Amino acid sequence: MGADMQPDYARLPEVDQQSCDGFVSSEFLPTRRDRRKGILYLVWFVFGVASGALLLKMLQDLPLLMTLDSSEAKLQSLLWMPTEIVVFQPNDLFASIPSPTSDRAWDELLGPSRGFVNFENPEEELGLPPGRPVPDDPKSAVYGISMFHQLHCLIMIREIYYGILLGEYNTTMFHVEMDNADGGADKDNHEHEHDRSGKAFKIKHTKHCFDYLQQSIRCAGLMQVEMPQGPDRNIFDGYGSPHVCKRWDITVFMEEHRVIEE
């Protein structure tokens, strides 16, 4: 750019020092660092007030917490189990048709306890309603654990399902047994109630299992995200996805409270 194109600048007029006497000196103006400190102090103040309010609320609720039934707290503590992350993977053993090996695998899920536990002084110590009496031990009672009840139901449904497919239950037999299980015309129906190995009892119990399992699944309400599988990502089988699961310390608990059959 040529010299003749240079812009002209005019000198600003000098300011009379006395005209600035009404302004605050810059040494008294807050710096950026001071403003940061002020914001930090404000944050800590708000945090302190919130913490104090929370502490006060806890102290106010303390009498209520202390009056909480200690037996209920003891029961919750007794039943608490640690969790772990488990990635579900296919298990052909449990997906296979009945065989001595697969049947044994399913049966072993119930363990020696078969899903029942024995508690001493359950009504006084744990706040439980009366359980099944234990012979020769009036202070103890037997209760069931829901996870094993659910497994028992799956085992029962599996038996009926494959029994129908393999011809152990023919269609006519199935409908007759279903009528009997519903309280049909069979006059010996009440006797079937006591035959827990009979087909009538198993069919009736399986009907109960469908209802019990749907309630159990909805009660657990697991909200863990499952990723799609397959080349087109359109298969949702639950495999390959992490799930938060109870650790199998449960088996130790069941053994410690195992019902000893005489």
Curated annotation (Swiss-Prot):
Q: Which residues form the signal peptide?
A: none
Task: Quote the disruption phenotype from the UniProt entry.
Answer: Abolishes the formation of phomopsin A and leads to the accumulation of a deoxy derivative of phomopsin A.
Alphabetized, the UniProt keywords read: Glycoprotein, Membrane, Oxidoreductase, Transmembrane, Transmembrane helix, Virulence
What pathway does this protein act in?
Mycotoxin biosynthesis
Instruction: Tell me a GO biological process for this protein.
Output: mycotoxin biosynthetic process
Q: Which cellular component appears as one GO term in the record?
A: membrane
Specify the protein's topology with respect to the membrane: Single-pass membrane protein
Its function, per the record, reads: UstYa family oxidase; part of the gene cluster that mediates the biosynthesis of the phomopsins, a group of hexapeptide mycotoxins which infects lupins and causes lupinosis disease in livestock. Within the pathway, phomYa catalyzes the hydroxylation of C-beta of Tyr. The pathway starts with the processing of the precursor phomA by several endopeptidases including kexin proteases as well as the cluster-specific S41 family peptidase phomP1 and the oligopeptidase phomG to produce 10 identical copies of the hexapeptide Tyr-Val-Ile-Pro-Ile-Asp.
For this chain, the family text in UniProt reads:
Belongs to the ustYa family.
Please state what the annotation says regarding this protein's domains: The 2 HXXHC motifs are conserved in ustYa family proteins and might form active sites.
What name does UniProt use for this protein? UstYa family oxidase phomYa
Source species: Diaporthe leptostromiformis
